[in-house]
Curated annotation (Swiss-Prot):
Protein known as: Putative esterase aq_1494
InterPro entries: 4-hydroxybenzoyl-CoA_TE, HB-CoA_thioesterase_AS, HotDog_dom_sf, YbgC/YbaW
Tree of life domain: Bacteria
Active site: 15
CDD domains per the UniProt record, alphabetical: 4HBT
UniProt GO molecular function: fatty acyl-CoA hydrolase activity
NCBIfam families documented for this protein: YbgC/FadM family acyl-CoA thioesterase
EC number: 3.1.-.-
Membership in a protein family: Belongs to the 4-hydroxybenzoyl-CoA thioesterase family.
Annotated keywords: Hydrolase
Organism per entry: Aquifex aeolicus (strain VF5)
Length: 128
């Protein structure tokens, strides 16, 4: 079951053609990740309090249809892969029932500038 994040396109997110600039999709994905973690009781601020940072290793997005100013859309987020050191999320952006973008991001955790294994309490939150 995906985590669903709902949002409306703001005017400043559009480009000269009146569509959402491609870079903003990655902001939407980051917002969805943050809300997903918050909904699990483990927001980024809690990880930072533990001295951990969530670092992006790679990101991919396939754009299928445009979004326009004032469109309401949903980001459906799923945890696709989880290992001791990395985790991967997939995203599908829907406008009504139409998929307008598909993406994934891979992450790791860093403490004191070095990649570390994902702490047990974070693994439990991600698995749940």
């Amino acid at each position: 079951m995906p985590f669903i994040y709902r949002r409306r396109v703001q005017f400043y997110e559009t480009d000269a053609q009146g569509i959402v600039h491609h870079s903003n999709y990655f902001r939407y994905f980051e917002e969805a990740r943050g809300e997903f973690l918050r909904s699990k009781g483990f927001p980024y601020s809690k990880m930072r309090d533990m001295g951990l940072e969530v670092v992006l290793l790679n990101a991919y997005c396939e754009y299928k249809k445009p979004l326009f100013y004032d469109d309401v859309f949903e980001v459906h987020l799923n945890l696709e892969e989880l290992s001791r050191f990395t985790f991967t999320f997939s995203y599908i952006v829907f406008k009504e029932d139409i998929a307008v973008a598909k993406a994934n991001t891979k992450h790791c955790m860093v403490k004191n500038g070095k990649i570390v294994s994902i702490p047990k309490e974070v693994l439990e939150v991600l698995k749940d």
